[in-house]
């Protein structure tokens, strides 16, 4: 997952949410689990290390990593995300979006 993304919709998953064009780790984000929708802090910590605060994982190694073995699945709503490219000493953000408007989450 990217390090910054956009939620410009006011009620994703029927939750009251203040739109942001710069959602960053540790902010509250709207998610949908199998049974309900809720706002949670964007980060992930395994049960055995509460202060790990991960924000992404590789799908191809997720099943083998001890950090993610007990993780529950969710859907994260978004309107788009940023990927950064370096040009010399400068980092330039490029905005991307997709039709699905959802990330897979843990």
Regions found by a protein language model. Give the residues of each.
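Short linear sequence motif anchored by a di-proline
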Residues: 1-106
């Amino acid at each position: 997952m990217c390090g910054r993304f956009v939620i410009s919709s006011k009620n994703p998953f029927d939750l009251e949410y203040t739109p942001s064009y710069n959602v960053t780790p540790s902010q509250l984000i709207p998610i949908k689990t199998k049974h309900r929708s809720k706002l949670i802090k964007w980060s992930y910590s395994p049960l055995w290390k509460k202060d790990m605060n991960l924000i992404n994982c590789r799908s191809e190694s997720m099943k083998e990593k001890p950090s993610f073995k007990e993780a529950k699945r969710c859907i994260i709503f978004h309107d788009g995300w940023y990927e950064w490219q370096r040009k010399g000493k400068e980092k330039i953000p490029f905005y991307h979006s997709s039709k699905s408007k959802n990330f897979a989450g843990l």
